[in-house]
UniProtKB/Swiss-Prot annotation:
Protein keywords: Aminoacyl-tRNA synthetase, ATP-binding, Cytoplasm, Ligase, Nucleotide-binding, Protein biosynthesis
Gene that produces this protein: gltX2
Main location: cytoplasm
Keyword Chloroplast tagged: no
Originating species: Syntrophomonas wolfei subsp. wolfei (strain DSM 2245B / Goettingen)
Protein name: Glutamate--tRNA ligase 2
Enzyme class (EC, first level): ligase
Residues that, per the record, bind ATP: K261
One GO MF term: ATP binding
Catalytic activity: tRNA(Glu) + L-glutamate + ATP = L-glutamyl-tRNA(Glu) + AMP + diphosphate
Motif range ('HIGH' region): 17-27
Length: 490
């Protein structure tokens, strides 16, 4: 369970999103892995909000993130919405706490005031770039005397505070996913821990929060690996015990580039709106980087939780395979009863142009519609596309045109028209078609195909008798008449 030298009495993890936008798929997976790890080992999870990016952070995104996590089926023992022993859980409400630890570092000579302007720093960066040197701060404000610092403060210059990086230190992390990773402090310049506006930087605040909240394991995306050496230095400078680290791989698009908007929907709320089920996304996200011991891939949240371990989390990048998500979602949809599915589809029908038709067809025919289309649904929003099959404009083109041009189609359609006004149940319609097949001495295919093409304009589709029962006899007759007129006009 816990490789490395740190022994912990209780597992405690955290998910700490920045409320700068909706919950991204990558963030949702990180939250899920934290939740699974805590649940698997009877631990606790904290939901913390890292909102030190004042320009982009929004309270509405906080609410959306919390709602998305709960919809996915995740829970936490303490956090921004539930409270707990380590309040507050929003970083901008913890500034006094960070100031206390900033003071300790300053007094110990492990941090210092930096008066460099952004313009000066940009010139310094450009000079390093032009000379091919490593991009890191020169440390010139490290050398300022007390008198020089006092003078700059008197001038009203608001300083940032930098951490004084110790020279010639090797920082080693036995990462629970990536194995041993080492960092040389000489590759890292003195870094800012508090900006000139008094707001702490991520690398500083996250360490203080994790320690004070008792976080034992930091499970996060691989892109945070480069932040780790800076955080380790702060842990050591303040004599804090380091947590265990586990950096999970990036999520790539189908082209094996980092997932972005060009690959399609990227936020959890978008998939929710499209009608993907939370259990399916839970299942799918768990399999992006983690694999169970067996071959089975359709696993319930309880089964995934019972089997989860960081030892089975891969180092290699996870690829977001929309076809796999679609397959998993279809499997979960198939498990849902018709009655429940009817209710789940209602929000997706509310703005449909065919809503009036559905309301007029009655409960029995609506139930038949749902049971007929359910196997064609990849996600709930697909119901709109399926309604086009039943109620959309018919275009006799392609295969349909060719089938309707066949010999003996008009007598077949007329025979169907004469019989359909007498029946309306699925079984009755099946018997009608069977009788026509026998009377006209045709093969079943030579009856089904022309009827389907005449009624829907398509050569393939849902069960024909169910389709006819859904649209109703009156509409079926109208379509048959139109098909006959079309054939005669050719």
């Amino acid at each position: 369970m816990c490789k490395g030298g740190n022994k912990v009495n209780k597992i405690k993890v955290r998910f700490a999103p920045s409320p700068t936008g909706p919950l991204h798929i990558g963030g949702a997976r990180s939250a899920l892995f934290n939740y699974l790890f805590a649940s698997r080992y009877n631990g606790e999870m904290v939901l913390r909000i890292e909102d030190t990016d004042l320009e982009r952070s929004r309270r509405e995104y906080e609410s959306e993130i919390i709602d998305s996590l709960k919809w996915l089926g995740l829970g936490w023992s303490e956090g921004i919405d539930t409270g707990g022993p380590n309040e507050p859980y929003r970083q901008t409400e913890r500034l006094a706490i960070y100031q206390e630890y900033t003071k300790k570092l300053l007094e110990a000579g492990q941090a210092y005031y930096c008066f460099c302007s952004e313009k000066e720093l940009e010139v310094e960066r450009q000079d390093l770039l032009d000379s091919g040197q490593m991009q890191k701060y020169s440390g010139k404000c490290r050398q300022l005397s007390m008198a020089e610092r006092e003078e700059k403060l008197k001038q009203g210059i608001k300083p940032a505070i930098r951490f004084k990086v110790p020279a010639h230190q090797l920082h080693i992390v036995d990462d629970l996913v990536r194995g041993r990773v080492s960092f040389d402090s000489d590759d890292i310049g003195d870094f800012i821990i508090v900006k000139s506006d008094g707001i702490p930087t991520y690398n500083f605040a996250v360490v203080i929060d994790d320690v004070l909240m008792g976080i034992s394991h930091v499970i996060r995306a691989e892109e945070h690996l480069s932040n780790t050496p800076r955080q380790l230095m702060i842990y050591d400078a303040l004599n804090f015990r380091r947590p265990e680290f586990a950096h999970i791989s990036l999520i790539l698009g189908s082209d094996r580039q980092k997932m972005s908007k060009r690959h399609g929907a990227t936020s959890l709320v978008q998939y929710r709106e499209m009608g993907y089920l939370p259990e399916a996304l839970f299942n799918f996200l768990a399999l992006m980087g983690w694999s169970p011991e067996g071959e089975e891939e359709i696993l319930s949240p309880a089964e995934i939780t019972a089997a989860f371990s960081l030892e089975r989390v891969a180092k290699s990048p996870a690829v977001f395979d929309i076809n796999k998500l679609n397959f998993i979602n279809q499997q979960y949809l198939k498990k849902i009863g018709d009655e429940e599915l009817k209710e789940m589809l209602k929000p997706y029908l509310a703005d449909s142009k065919y809503l009036k038709k559905i309301e007029q067809m009655g409960e029995e025919r609506y139930e038949l519609l749902v049971s007929t289309i359910r196997d064609y649904l990849v996600c709930l929003a697909d119901v709109k596309e399926q309604l086009e099959v039943f109620f959309g404009d018919i275009d006799y083109a392609g295969d349909a045109r060719e089938v309707l041009a066949g010999e003996g189609v008009i007598p077949l359609l007329q025979a169907f028209k004469e019989g359909i006004h007498k029946v309306n149940k699925v079984e009755e319609i099946k018997q009608l078609i069977k009788g026509i097949t026998k009377t006209l001495k045709l093969k079943p295919r030579d009856v089904f195909m022309p009827l389907r093409c005449a009624l829907s304009g398509q050569a393939h589709g849902p069960d024909l008798s169910s389709y006819i029962a859904v649209i109703g006899g009156e509409e079926a007759i109208r379509r048959i008449d139109r098909a006959i007129d079309f054939i005669k006009s050719q």
